[in-house]
């Protein structure tokens, strides 16, 4: 369903709107509303997107994953991060359940912090082609050193409110 279909969903009222929305979701999104297991790896995880209902406006979308996990590729020990994703959509938005499943697919995936953070950013850019994207990976210490990894696709668009990510630098007990 393209832009016209989305416009029909938004303009419908009452029961018609509910039916239109349900039809839209079942025709375009395969994971939302379904029992879907965690993907075996980030490579096979599917990031689903849908048409931006407001492509005439620039606005920021934020997702926060405070309990992101992956595995150290050398020791197999778990690594933990607080991820903050900000993006300004163009024509497509990422569907939140598919994003949650994609992020969860890293749970048993071995990769260094930098690789995890940049892989997530690159996959999101490929799926949505946003106007602007920023990902902050605030990794908890391993071996005594916190590693924070930041990616930004460029300068944020003028006139878009981009709040601080709000994650304090790691201080431990100090």
Swiss-Prot record:
* Pathway annotation from the record: tRNA modification; tRNA-queuosine biosynthesis
Please give the catalytic activity noted in the UniProt record.
Answer: 7-aminomethyl-7-carbaguanine + 2 NADP(+) = 7-cyano-7-deazaguanine + 2 NADPH + 3 H(+)
The top EC class, named as a word, is oxidoreductase
Compartmental location? Cytoplasm
Q: What residues bind substrate, as annotated?
A: 94-96, 113-114
**Which is an annotated Pfam family here?**
QueF
Gene Ontology biological process terms from the UniProt entry: queuosine biosynthetic process; tRNA modification
Q: Its GO CC terms?
A: cytoplasm
In this protein, the active site sits at 72 (thioimide intermediate), 79 (proton donor)
Could you tell me the EC number(s) of this protein? 1.7.1.13
Its annotated function is as follows: Catalyzes the NADPH-dependent reduction of 7-cyano-7-deazaguanine (preQ0) to 7-aminomethyl-7-deazaguanine (preQ1).
Q: What protein am I looking at? A: NADPH-dependent 7-cyano-7-deazaguanine reductase
Species annotation: Synechococcus elongatus (strain ATCC 33912 / PCC 7942 / FACHB-805)
Taxonomic placement: Bacteria, Bacillati, Cyanobacteriota, Cyanophyceae, Synechococcales
């Amino acid at each position: 369903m393209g832009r016209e279909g989305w416009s029909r969903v938004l303009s419908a009222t009452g029961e018609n709107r509910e039916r239109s929305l349900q039809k839209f979701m079942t025709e375009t999104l395969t994971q939302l509303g379904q029992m879907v297991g965690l993907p075996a790896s980030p490579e096979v995880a599917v990031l689903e997107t849908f048409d931006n209902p407001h492509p005439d406006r620039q606005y920021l979308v934020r997702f926060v994953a405070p309990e992101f996990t992956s595995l150290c590729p050398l020791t197999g020990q778990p690594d933990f991060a607080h991820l903050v994703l900000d993006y300004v959509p163009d024509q497509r938005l990422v569907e939140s359940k598919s994003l949650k499943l994609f992020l969860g697919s890293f749970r048993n995936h071995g990769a260094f912090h930098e690789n995890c953070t940049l892989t997530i950013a690159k996959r999101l850019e490929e799926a949505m082609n946003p106007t602007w994207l920023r990902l902050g990976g605030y990794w908890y210490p391993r071996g005594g050193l916190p590693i924070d990894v930041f990616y930004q696709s460029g300068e944020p668009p003028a006139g878009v409110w981009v709040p601080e990510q709000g994650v304090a630098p790691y201080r431990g007990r100090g």
